[in-house]
Amino acid sequence: MNSQQFPRQAASMPSPQVSNSGASVGQNVQGQGDEVARDMDVQSRDLLGAGTVLPSRDDKQEPVVVRPYPQVQMFTSHHPLQPAPSLTMTAQPAHLTSAVPLSFSENILKQTSKSTMPSRPIAPAPPSAMSAVPKVSGQGTVTMESGLPQTSAIPVATISGQQGHPNSLHHIMAATNVHMSIIRSSAPGPPLHIGASHLPRGAAAAAVMSSSKVTTMLRPASAQIPSAAAAQSATQHIIHPPIQSRPPVTTTSLTPAVVATVSATRAQSPVITTTPAHAAEPVLRPTLSIQQHPPPSAISIQRSAQARDAATTRITLPTHPALGVQKPQLHAMTQKTLFGTGNPVAAATVAPILATNTLPSVTTSGSAPHTQVPTSTIVSMTMPTHSSHATAVTASNIPVAKVVPQQITHTSPRIQSDYGTERGNLIPIPGHRASPNPMTMEARSENRQPVPVQLQYFLPTYPPSAYPLAAHTYTPITSSVSTIRQYPVSAQAPNSAITAQSVASTVHLNQMQLINMDTSHARHIQGIQPAPVSAQGIQQSPFSAQGIQATPISTQGIQPTQMNTQAIHPATSITNQGVQTSSVSSQQASSEPKASVVLAEGATIVANPINGAFNATPGGTTVMQSHSQSPGIGSSPAQGSSPRPSILRKKPATDGTKPKADLHAAVAPGVTGDPGIADQPSAAASLPSSHHPAAAVPSPPSQPASGSMPSSIHITPATIPALSAPPPLLSNAPSGAVMPEAKVKEEAEPMDISRPVSVPLLPPNSISSPLTVLANNISIPVGELLPGASPRKKPRKQQHVISTEEGDMMETNSTDEERCHAVKPLTSRPEKRKSPPKEYIDEEGVRYVPVRPRPPITLLRHYRNPWKAAYHHFQRYSDVRVKEEKKLTLQEVANQKGITCRVQGWKTHLCAAQLLQLIKLEQDVFERLTVLQEGLVPKKKTATDDDLHRINELIQGNMQRCKLVMDQITESRDCMLKVLDHKDRVLKLLNKSGASRRLSKVKQKDKM
């Protein structure tokens, strides 16, 4: 995504990563270098995590730069990866504060952007601008730390509407603050945000999202103001302007100065909980998580004053050794900053993923390090690609927003356990951007304890299927809790990432995450990089918490983690092809199979577990499926596609099914059987591929490490054309990846097309196979399309679904905590709401139970205008046909029941008898009248009496009438009875014709 977003911004990629922190820097830098290179290549993701993030992730968990800890050092090994092209890392302070602008060589950026999404109109905003993020202004732009560059990417969309800031948000966590606001309602921007929200990776993504038009430009943070810049860098691509209304959202900078200590924030709002929440919401969330782990206090997120507008907010995560980086550096956190890596997650869409959880618990122990911190990383979730996703752009129509992650947050509760205070991970970020996929980053921090592995979700298991399934449900597995909260869909898995630690890979549930995407694929995108982490996770090292990232270092020496690959962030490349190449995988050079999975862009990808693929072969990268499905996928719209929602997006030629095939193939090899299992990590990877391929990319993280990384990306390319630039982005993502938690909302239930998509993560090298499974998850949100389904059709279907399914839409829209209606995509406004259905307990033990808004009760709702009433009313003569009477044959008449009785004429006789009675009555009257008449007639006619005469006449008349009646009735009766004269003949005929049948029956009875 980043690259998409920032393609133009070569410089943009701030080195911040390097800056991450002193020690970190070293490590980061190395990692970053690679990452950067990768980013550059990928460019797509570049903002996402700018190299930093990725490396961080490699560390193990803490992909995000945010981790202030020296983690980076671990990455040192990664250095080789450094190869990234000129990516310049500023050696800014590790702190977030430094806004280290990441510089990507223009070439790389361009390259990436070109290859990936030429179309993507998003241009990175100049770093300064970034800072300013004019659009964002309200936005809580959180600047990701420079270290987080990667992160920054995420923030972009994520923030989206959060902005808001500063105050409340920061409280929440400084970082959070921004997002918080989003969550809250905050930002006016939200409407815009919606679109942006999705964007997973960086502001750019957000921008894309936000503005329908390409218009959005993200500027790289690089130039940005130092402070702001630092934050910004990550953000840099803030979408701000492009973002349209929600520019702010874009704000990437997670970094917000920590205005408040994260720890405190936690309490502040369950939702936000973590600082990360703010700005990049998605990103942040992850960040949040990160913060979580460390002591609350440690995390202090500062928000620069300017932060509000610039969203420079810095987040300082607590430094935790766990991170690998030295604890001391609290601010180092900058590095961590919100998961620089995670940032990508920020891509709003992904937020749900919230890798966050993944990291968090990595470290079980309370030890300071708690790799957990990396958890934040999870944020990686970064949907970056997502962001790219046109989806954002569509903001309004895109359902994406739907995604509204429901905040994986629920997991948070679990997390909470470890660090009660830290709330960060909760960070719902829901508000953010209304984006459908609000990231919900739920940084979750995973304070949860490490419980690490637990995750293991293996979302994969259900991966593909689940997604489509309930968008709402998100399986979010919240990794932290070991529980797998199996929200069906939720990509949640992230946790696993965290736990992975040892597990390595820790699978990111990502795939779950994806799921949601539902609708908005944005969500899926969500994607979250987690995968990467998970891949890394493999590393046993304690980092494991760090999850992947660190792990790479440790375990892999290779550092395969190099999420860079991840950087791939499919968004960019994928978008085009969907491929996303996952070059990461190729990176594989290391032996890691990590194969980046890139998740395929499209839902298509879903099936493919890329991960596995790459697991299987490091090169695997193959995964890349570009499955360009992209359109469907949240992944950035392919190729410069417009911001329009993926659903609407036209598929690039590349997009066609072909990539998909690749994907599958890749997967098969790598994954093969594994998917189900390995996937754990993979899940992370699974990240919402849909949303942003970038996320998908994350899987690559695993890819090998060191130096090769950058190149590896390239290598992958062979496999996956699209791949090219994305990897770097990816890498950033990885750190974020760690936070697989983000659950993608499954937002859209049926509709959510994106949701299903999960990007498989590329799990840690070792884990790799698990990863693959995730990829599968990626299925298209919409209809759980089969992997085979053609992407082309899907989108249309999705759109339809979106418009039809109010519930889904609504859900997506809202965030976990509060349904953020912020901006529902025009098309799917109703759907947004669905996201929420997830239950979670925040760190403070407050239990949030999603309440599904019930539609108003209306009789009309179920009223259908039936045609029944018109059935008997005819409008033209032709409508009526006179029924012809059937003439019976003698045979038929003879066979009628009771025919003989009728022939006897009993009715006629009955009637005749009654007529006879009438005649008798008349006769009686006649006789009486006769008697009366005789009595009245004077015997003597001498005296004529008029009265008597008159009476006499009347009697005479009545007598005549009686005679007449009697005669007529008698006649009628006689005529009537004459009918019976033929009775004998009729009986004869009937017996003849009816005999055969009757006789046969009689005979049969006799025989019986």
Swiss-Prot record:
Residues 1-44, 113-134, 415-435, 617-720 are annotated as: Disordered. It holds the Pfam family SAP130_C. One of its GO terms (biological process) is negative regulation of transcription by RNA polymerase II. Residues 35-44 have a biased composition (Basic and acidic residues). Residues 1-31, 618-644 have a biased composition (Polar residues). It comes from the Eukaryota. Residues 678-697 have a biased composition (Low complexity). The keyword Lipoprotein does not apply. InterPro entries: His_deAcase_cplx_SAP130, SAP130_C. One of its GO terms (cellular component) is Sin3-type complex. Keywords: Nucleus, Repressor, Transcription, Transcription regulation. It is found in: Nucleus. Acts as a transcriptional repressor. Belongs to the SAP130 family. This is Histone deacetylase complex subunit SAP130-A. It comes from Xenopus laevis (African clawed frog).
